């Protein structure tokens, strides 16, 4: 006899609805007022491989300045709500607030194109595995050699209103406790903000070389004790509010120039099922199978330059369509096509004959930048829904606009100390801070202040003229070409000539 029974499957419940993230175009109203802002010539000079400390202190006397470093500019903008506007009727200060929208940017780069070499005087190179004539496993105590190379070629520009995020491989936490000295450490993908001076991926991977390479000779000098970061494009593209990356420009290229293997004891033994043992001629013990190429960025040409040209932001990749929250903008730049390292030579003696020991050689690298922007004045209508949304997105935004949460007065008697930082009283941990803290105070950026560099005269600046030409409102020529009117007597004169022939 057949009996009906209910299904054993679990009941499907719909997922919890996700709170909708609004685009800035939904609550930001754009005006027809545009401003130009630009920096002066920004210069930096230093040693391309390492900082040079002072003899008395650990403070760097000559900083490390390399073309393979990130340049992260933190651009400070004036508060538009305290700005001298051409028309005070643009917005209602009781119900609206003004913000800046970045609509155009141009990153200018000076200095000629050039290739700067990197390397290590004690590079971990065992054999040339591309043109090897013998396979052996005899490894001496020290087979390091002086090797130089041209790194991977990278051009990069990221624009956003929060610092860009980078990723790299670091040392993770092992699950088992009985680890021994010499065991391979676990790897962990670490995400952290990209700061000014961080090293880019030069072709050896994005990783913490100071922790993961103990011999200090597997990579060139400029990164052997540094962390190379790669922009976390996936994370920034998936960011809910789209603040860290409005848009980005990227060009990378490299190829493997030389092929080496590493000296050292193989931590991972090759399984015997993968080869047949040899006899004699050094093949009874196989050599190192830890192969490593030296990268090369190949040819540099002015035809493939991302810089010194304007870019117009019409639609950002995220929900933030170019609005500069907190009146700041972060511009991240990498340009390895101008990586020339200048060699300086100073003589220590006035000898008439050449003696190499009488000359000192120095290395320096210099960089030149110029930032230009077009900002559009926008306004936000402060309805209760929009204020609640902005508070959820950034709780300090309303405080900057002089909106605070007023608590109801307390009916109980509370204690208020006069000197809250005094050692004579109990620690006042719950006391509110006297001054607002910068959320990026512990991060290193190249500070650029544009509070005094805004101008409405767009036609007086290079990027402003390009922007006006894009809008079709550029200055037209005052010389007009007038066409000569057609003659009205041509037909009658022709008829007269015909009659005259008769």
From Swiss-Prot:
<keyword id="KW-1048">Host nucleus</keyword>
<dbReference type="GO" id="GO:0039620">
    <property type="term" value="C:T=7 icosahedral viral capsid"/>
</dbReference>
<feature type="region of interest" description="Disordered">
    <location>
        <begin position="480"/>
        <end position="502"/>
    </location>
</feature>
<keyword id="KW-0946">Virion</keyword>
<keyword id="KW-0945">Host-virus interaction</keyword>
<dbReference type="InterPro" id="IPR002210">
    <property type="entry name" value="Capsid_L1_Papillomavir"/>
</dbReference>
<keyword id="KW-1162">Viral penetration into host cytoplasm</keyword>
<comment type="function">
    <text>Forms an icosahedral capsid with a T=7 symmetry and a 50 nm diameter. The capsid is composed of 72 pentamers linked to each other by disulfide bonds and associated with L2 proteins. Binds to heparan sulfate proteoglycans on cell surface of basal layer keratinocytes to provide initial virion attachment. This binding mediates a conformational change in the virus capsid that facilitates efficient infection. The virion enters the host cell via endocytosis. During virus trafficking, L1 protein dissociates from the viral DNA and the genomic DNA is released to the host nucleus.</text>
</comment>
<dbReference type="Pfam" id="PF00500">
    <property type="entry name" value="Late_protein_L1"/>
</dbReference>
<keyword id="KW-0167">Capsid protein</keyword>
<dbReference type="GO" id="GO:0075509">
    <property type="term" value="P:endocytosis involved in viral entry into host cell"/>
</dbReference>
<keyword id="KW-1161">Viral attachment to host cell</keyword>
<dbReference type="GO" id="GO:0042025">
    <property type="term" value="C:host cell nucleus"/>
</dbReference>
<dbReference type="GO" id="GO:0019062">
    <property type="term" value="P:virion attachment to host cell"/>
</dbReference>
<keyword id="KW-1164">Virus endocytosis by host</keyword>
<dbReference type="InterPro" id="IPR011222">
    <property type="entry name" value="dsDNA_vir_gr_I_capsid"/>
</dbReference>
<dbReference type="GO" id="GO:0005198">
    <property type="term" value="F:structural molecule activity"/>
</dbReference>
<keyword id="KW-1160">Virus entry into host cell</keyword>
<comment type="similarity">
    <text>Belongs to the papillomaviridae L1 protein family.</text>
</comment>
<comment type="subunit">
    <text>Self-assembles into homopentamers. The capsid has an icosahedral symmetry and consists of 72 capsomers, with each capsomer being a pentamer of L1. Interacts with the minor capsid protein L2; this interaction is necessary for viral genome encapsidation. Interacts with protein E2; this interaction enhances E2-dependent replication and transcription activation.</text>
</comment>
<keyword id="KW-1015">Disulfide bond</keyword>
<protein>
    <recommendedName>
        <fullName>Major capsid protein L1</fullName>
    </recommendedName>
</protein>
<dbReference type="InterPro" id="IPR036973">
    <property type="entry name" value="Capsid_L1_sf_Papillomavir"/>
</dbReference>
<keyword id="KW-0426">Late protein</keyword>
<keyword id="KW-1145">T=7 icosahedral capsid protein</keyword>
């Amino acid at each position: 006899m057949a009996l009906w029974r209910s299904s054993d499957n679990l009941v499907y419940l719909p997922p919890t609805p996700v709170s909708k993230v609004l685009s800035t175009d939904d609550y930001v109203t754009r005006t027809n007022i545009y401003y130009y802002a630009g920096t002066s010539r920004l210069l930096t000079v230093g040693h391309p491989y390492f900082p040079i400390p002072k003899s008395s202190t650990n403070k760097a006397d000559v900083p490390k300045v390399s073309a393979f470093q990130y340049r992260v500019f933190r651009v400070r903008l004036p508060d538009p709500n305290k700005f001298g506007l051409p028309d005070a009727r643009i917005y209602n200060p009781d119900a609206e607030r003004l913000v800046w929208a970045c609509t155009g940017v141009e990153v200018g780069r000076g200095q000629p194109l050039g290739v700067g070499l990197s390397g290590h005087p004690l590079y971990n190179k065992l054999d040339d595995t591309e043109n090897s004539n013998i396979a052996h496993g005899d490894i001496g105590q020290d087979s390091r050699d002086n090797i130089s190379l041209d790194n991977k070629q990278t051009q990069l520009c990221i624009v956003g209103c929060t610092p860009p995020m980078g990723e790299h491989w670091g040392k993770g936490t092992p699950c088992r406790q009985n680890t021994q000295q010499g065991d391979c450490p676990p790897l962990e993908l670490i995400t952290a903000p990209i700061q000014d001076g961080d090293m880019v991926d030069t072709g050896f991977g994005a990783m913490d070389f100071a922790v993961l390479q103990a011999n200090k000779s597997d990579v060139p000098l400029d990164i052997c004790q540094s962390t190379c970061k790669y922009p976390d494009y996936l994370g920034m593209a998936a960011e809910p509010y789209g603040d860290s990356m409005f848009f980005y420009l990227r060009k990378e290229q490299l190829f493997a120039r030389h092929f080496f293997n590493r000296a050292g004891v193989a931590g991972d033994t090759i399984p015997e099922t993968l080869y047949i043992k040899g006899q004699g001629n050094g093949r009874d013990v196989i050599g190192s199978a830890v192969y490593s190429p030296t990268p090369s960025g190949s040819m540099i040409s002015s035809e493939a330059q991302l810089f010194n040209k304007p870019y117009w932001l019409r639609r950002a990749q995220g929900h933030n369509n170019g609005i500069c929250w907190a009146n700041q903008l972060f511009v991240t730049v990498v340009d390895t096509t101008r990586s020339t390292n200048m060699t300086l030579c100073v003589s220590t003696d006035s000898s008439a004959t050449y003696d190499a020991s009488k000359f000192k050689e120095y290395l320096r690298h210099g960089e030149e930048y110029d930032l230009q922007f077009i900002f559009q004045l926008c306004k936000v209508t402060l309805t209760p829904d929009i204020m609640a949304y902005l508070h959820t997105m950034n709780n300090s935004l309303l405080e900057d606009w002089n909106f605070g949460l007023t608590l109801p007065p307390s009916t109980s008697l509370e204690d208020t100390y006069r000197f809250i930082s005094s050692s004579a009283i109990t620690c006042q941990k719950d006391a509110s801070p006297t001054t607002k803290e910068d959320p990026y105070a512990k991060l290193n950026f190249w500070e650029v202040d544009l509070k005094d560099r805004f101008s409405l005269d767009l036609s007086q600046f290079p990027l402003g003229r390009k922007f006006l030409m894009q809008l079709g409102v550029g200055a037209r020529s005052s010389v007009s070409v007038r066409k000569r009117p057609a003659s009205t007597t041509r037909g009658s004169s022709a008829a007269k000539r015909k009659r005259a022939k008769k």
